[in-house]
């Protein structure tokens, strides 16, 4: 996929594998979005692996949309983006040469700060949530990320990180906002506090710095979330169980990685010991 705003996108899908793709010269390389579209179809169980994601630095040329989470918000120079989707595993990808971020994981509050407000209650009742849970980003080869960050959506974050002397712009960004609010009971009854199996985790992604503007472990206040930025190589260092391969049965025949595809690197049968 080349020269698009969204290189390849998984949107409002359950049980999807995105693998063995090349995404380059787009605005954002690989997108996993769960949007509040109100049709009872919302996303989870997505694996992103074995992809080559390089130089997705094209200017965002999408028209504005009435949906605050449309692709018009994608910051140029972003490799992989997860927006308000649960249960996502991102592993064994090559992610290189992105001006803004190699990986971004965000709640929908980044797109609309009122994402748990009255206008969203019918969609929340329909099954959508603005937070991300159980995201595991691990064992990716990430190089040269964040040399020239840009994008209207995250301009405040760019200013915060680049103008704070003890911080520097990270290659991996987690907003932390939804998790902080949920852990402080500020989203009840919409979203409970995160359990261990619902945390956002980053492991073994090389020397890439990880950052967040809102520390999930910091309490929000009555007036709102607490800005508590941090950057480090070992932030959010945890792991989650591997997600199962996605399969599809069509006209009685089953398809999927490890089912009809047994030759791709990640789909080969395990050796018999």
Which positions does each model-derived feature cover?
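Right-handed parallel beta-helix
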Residues: 1-6, 14-28, 32, 42-57, ...
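Acidic/polar low-complexity surface segments
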Residues: 27-78, 100-132, 143-188, 208, ...
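C-terminal functional modules
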Residues: 177-273
């Amino acid at each position: 996929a080349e020269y698009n705003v969204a290189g390849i996108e998984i949107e409002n899908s359950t049980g999807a594998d995105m693998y063995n793709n090349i995404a380059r010269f787009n605005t954002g390389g690989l997108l996993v979005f769960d949007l509040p579209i109100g049709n009872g179809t919302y996303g989870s169980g997505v694996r992103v692996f074995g992809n080559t994601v390089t130089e997705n630095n094209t200017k965002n040329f999408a028209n504005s949309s009435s949906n605050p989470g449309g692709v018009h918000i994608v910051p140029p120079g972003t490799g992989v983006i997860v927006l308000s989707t649960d249960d996502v595993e991102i592993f064994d990808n090559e992610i290189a040469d992105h001006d803004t971020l190699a990986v971004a994981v965000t709640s929908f509050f980044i797109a609309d700060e009122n994402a748990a407000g009255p206008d969203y209650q019918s969609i929340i009742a329909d099954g959508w949530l603005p937070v991300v849970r159980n995201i595991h980003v691990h064992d990716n080869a990430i190089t040269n990320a964040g040399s020239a960050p840009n994008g209207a959506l995250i301009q405040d974050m760019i200013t915060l990180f680049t103008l704070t002397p003890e911080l520097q712009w990270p290659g991996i960004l987690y907003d932390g906002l939804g998790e902080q609010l949920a852990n402080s009971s500020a989203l009840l009854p919409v979203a409970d506090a995160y359990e261990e199996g619902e945390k956002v985790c980053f492991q073994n992604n090389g020397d890439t710095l990880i950052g967040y503007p809102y520390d999930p472990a910091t309490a929000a206040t009555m007036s709102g979330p607490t800005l508590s930025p941090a950057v480090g190589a070992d932030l959010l260092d945890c792991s989650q169980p591997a997600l199962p391969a996605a399969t599809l049965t069509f006209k009685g025949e089953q398809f999927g990685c490890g089912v009809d595809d047994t030759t791709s690197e990640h789909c080969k049968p395990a050796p018999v010991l």
